[in-house]
Amino acid sequence: TRRLSARWTFEAAQDAESMHGVDVEAEIMQALAQEIVVEIDQEIIGSLRTLAGAGTTLDFSSLSGTSIYVGDRHAALAIEINRAANRIAARTRRGAGNYIVVSPEALTILQSASTSTFARTTEGSFEAPTNTKFVGTLNGSIKVFADNYAADGTKVLVGYKGSSETDAPAFYCPYIPLMSTGPVMDPSSFEPVVSFMTRYGYKELTNTASSLGNAADYVDAVTLSNVAFQ
């Protein structure tokens, strides 16, 4: 269960409407709903990163060969992601990794790589009510999602999701997606209060006693070190 609430004053709502034409109630309700979605996103992504473990490390300072400019070195990330995707295929016998979740830093590397086949999504497709956005496709088959809350140095999450609902490393099962009380009056302060609640289950099949215990086979990771952009 996840709950979130907020309150405001009638004076603030009246002044905002009069001076700026802003509906404070609508803005707060939208912000609360967005915050719950963000928290669920971050919980799931964090759990998958933990499930993936350390993965492999790509040290940009130890790359061999003669590079022309920094974009040549950045191209190594796409190769390492392909290796991680193929490791998933070998472990699961289902398919290669078909999505990645990257930090803004890793996204910049993919965008600036000289030989990477990263195709950006068209403008307008970025809009979504989450903090994790679909930003393009790598090598024609791997969907790229950017986690805007990820700090520099956050490892790249590589995962596989099959065509069926059960062909996945983890399961998010909402049974009360989002419930709102609507604005209610606090009799002690004469302030409107609004609350949101969601209830869901989240499960990773890691226990071999009750399942195949192969959830970790569906995910991998690439850790970046000594990243340079010049």
Enumerate the predicted regions with their spans.
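Sequence/fold signature of self-assembling virion shell proteins
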Residues: 2-13, 17, 22-26, 30, ...
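Intrinsically disordered or highly flexible coil/loop and linker segments, enriched in small
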Residues: 3, 15, 37-54, 87-98, ...
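Generic detector of intrinsically disordered, low-complexity, polar/charged segments
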Residues: 50-52, 58, 62, 68, ...
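Alpha-helical scaffold segments that mediate packing/assembly in large oligomeric complexes
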Residues: 8-10, 14-15, 19-83
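Extended, solvent-exposed, turn-rich assembly/linker loops in the middle of proteins
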Residues: 57-126
